[in-house]
Amino acid sequence: DRDAKLAQADGKIPIEEFEYKVRRLINDYIRPPKNEYKLDRALWWMDRFKKELRTDVRIANKHDLFKAYEVENIIHCAAMSALASKERKESRWGLWHMRSDYPMKDDEHWMKHIVLKQGDSFDDIRISYAPIIKM
């Protein structure tokens, strides 16, 4: 139950410090230039942050609870971004998706959308592809 977070009033990490740490690590590992190592590290950190948010973060009041929901969503979006970036083995769209380990554009294999869909659980993210429809 998400509201059980209110029982974490004795957590060691204030939610504001935790949010700062999450945002800093996202900036370090998910922003361009990207590569497999950085994206793997990002996914490792997002998994760790999900666990820390449940066990170590201090949530003393409703304000902290709403902040925790926001940080939880930030972690989830960052994990999806890292997964999609890791899946695309090329560089495309200028700086937005520049991969140092795949520096060239590859229309033959990657002229398609990467579609992420959440499955039955928070951690179940499914990857599929969709064609680009030119109008």
Report each predicted region and the residues it spans.
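Glycine- and aromatic-enriched mobile tails/lids
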Residues: 1-135
